[in-house]
Curated annotation (Swiss-Prot):
Molecular functions per Gene Ontology: metal ion binding; peptide deformylase activity
Protein name: Peptide deformylase 1
InterPro entries associated with the record: Peptide_deformylase, Peptide_deformylase_sf
Name of encoding gene: def1
Catalysis: reaction(s): N-terminal N-formyl-L-methionyl-[peptide] + H2O = N-terminal L-methionyl-[peptide] + formate
């Protein structure tokens, strides 16, 4: 396993739309293992392949307190979302130290493949539902800050560029 470099907003590669995984093979399983290691090391609760500059439909998530309930979603698709919506404070490994409110469906049903290539469906709510939607946005080339006002987006870009310059010194 290896730690992968996480792209930082506003890197244009974060806006690439991920392609479906054709076959779940050893290359994809290695990607999943590397993504999980990277996510846990960061530390984060979710990571999309897009964030590590691999533009295939793969996400890893672990919202457990114990950090030992890894969930893998390959070629995920939301097949149902509740009309009820909820506002959550969201953050992102590609947008470090920035948190803001995003409104999303409160409950979703997702269909995907696991790391063995087996199809499954999961209906969930709460933090896991939010995380699935957030990571799936990455696969579509969207970062959570794009739900915010243009003014907030601009402030975030300025703040992140300032942090990048400070780290470069």
């Amino acid at each position: 396993m290896a730690l992968l470099n996480i792209l930082q907003y506003p890197d244009p590669r974060l806006h690439k739309v991920a392609k479906p995984v054709a076959v779940v093979d050893d290359r994809i399983r290695k990607l999943v293992a590397d993504m999980a290691e990277t996510m846990y090391d960061a530390p984060g609760i979710g990571l999309a392949a897009t964030q590590v500059d691999v533009h295939e439909r793969v996400i890893t998530i672990d919202v457990s307190e114990s950090r030992d309930e890894l969930r893998v979603f390959i070629n995920p698709e939301i097949v149902w979302a509740s009309e009820a919506r909820k506002v959550w404070d969201e953050g992102c490994l590609s947008v470090p130290d920035i948190y803001d409110k995003v409104e999303r469906p409160d409950r979703v049903r997702v269909r995907a493949l696991n790391e063995k290539g087996e199809s499954f469906e999961l209906e969930t709510d709460g933090l896991l539902a939010v995380c699935i939607q957030h990571e799936m946005d990455h696969l579509m080339g969207k970062v959570f800050v794009e739900y915010l006002s243009p003014l907030k987006q601009n402030r975030i870009k300025i703040k992140l560029k300032k942090h990048q310059l400070e780290r470069a010194r």
